[in-house]
């Protein structure tokens, strides 16, 4: 079962990591740390170097337990501007900012959802 509080906490934590386009390194490092903590095999590359970014791709592998086609989950780490110093606020169940920055829901909400899915798969020993 999806843990909504944990999912929200994960999103809020990721939203506060500065990762405007070409400056995604901190977000990538956090994802590597979190994925390794979940026991996944993690690999990175130097894709960002080709276009002036300090970022990199993060690929993680969780072996399945039954035969079949793999499932791929994908999201991007960079945000548009103004995306530095994000301070998410929650009012009446709605997540927003003070208006001086974006929220970074695109695509840190996707990253948080992927991380929650992986946690649930592992916790419930799903195939």
Give the positions of each predicted feature.
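Intrinsically disordered, low-complexity segments enriched in polar/charged residues with Gly/Pro
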Residues: 1, 45-47, 73-74
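N-terminal capping segment at the start of a domain
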Residues: 1-25
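Short amphipathic alpha-helical segments, especially helix-boundary/capping motifs
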Residues: 4-9, 35-36, 88-94
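Predominant activation on well-ordered alpha-helical scaffold segments within soluble catalytic domains
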Residues: 8, 12, 29-32, 111-119
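Bulky hydrophobic/aromatic packing residues
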Residues: 11, 27, 72-74
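Generic secondary-structure signature for well-ordered alpha-helical cores
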Residues: 12-16, 20, 36-41, 119-127
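A non-catalytic alpha/beta surface segment that caps or lines the substrate-entry region
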Residues: 20-67
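Active-site metal-coordination/substrate-binding segment of hydrolases
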Residues: 54, 61, 67-127
